UniProtKB/Swiss-Prot annotation:
Biological process according to GO: translation
Keyword RNA-binding: yes
GO CC aspect terms: ribonucleoprotein complex; ribosome
Natural source organism: Nitratidesulfovibrio vulgaris (strain ATCC 29579 / DSM 644 / CCUG 34227 / NCIMB 8303 / VKM B-1760 / Hildenborough)
Name this protein carries in UniProt: Small ribosomal subunit protein uS11
InterPro entries: Ribosomal_uS11, Ribosomal_uS11_bac-type, Ribosomal_uS11_CS, Ribosomal_uS11_sf
Keyword Ribonucleoprotein: yes
Keywords per UniProt: Ribonucleoprotein, Ribosomal protein, RNA-binding, rRNA-binding
Amino acid sequence: MARPKRTVKKREKKNVPVGLAHIQATFNNTIVTFTDTRGNTISWASAGQSGFKGSRKSTPFAAQMAAEQAAKKAQENGMRTVGIYVKGPGSGREAAMRAINAAGFKVAFIRDITPIPHNGCRPPKRRRV
């Protein structure tokens, strides 16, 4: 018996000219997410998703590649102007911002939204290398 053909719905491209780029740079990875102004995700990429594994995920080059990948997908959805939010202490912060700028976006603003505790949780113990 022949199985009926299943039609796959093609994901429609949203036309979002203005959006936000969220860069989360941790010590182990960098995640770049492009959203519309209301916070709905349009595209995202991370250093791990870009093919880097282990300690190479935390490098500035990996962050640059992730930002380029996410920016390309966002531009396909019509994004031209972005505001950048940066969170975290990682080494990929500046590299990701530079990659977004080089991708041809008009950067409206750059804001650091790294959460700072008012003496909340106890931090991890100091590393002895």
